[in-house]
């Protein structure tokens, strides 16, 4: 018996997820997208997995380039998460004009200086999964590691680590 799409979406909204900004530097520009489907896969070798819409440009660019940065966002970075979750967004560099960042050593992707953590990654493998792809990323380095409250997505809202909704600045 097929699962009702609305019930499926409602069930997943009950699951709190950390928020990351995935960035890729291609031959022309920088691409970034907000992702809530990050998980640790292995400590040796260090692998994480992300889910991306199979037909989306970020998945296409990531598979073509083969490397990226994964920036773990803090509770004070909800505006950034919203910017990079919007359809038809401009270059990542334009969306980060007032935000300090640098290049990751291996991927050359954007790493946010204010992220809680940033992982410099190469693509290990890609697994088709319905409307999405699951991308296994090998972590080549951790150029940013800080302490702070994480940004969390819960019930369609940005929240802090305790689940309290964040107010717009």
Annotate each PLM feature.
Residues 1-169:
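Basic, polyanion-binding surface patches
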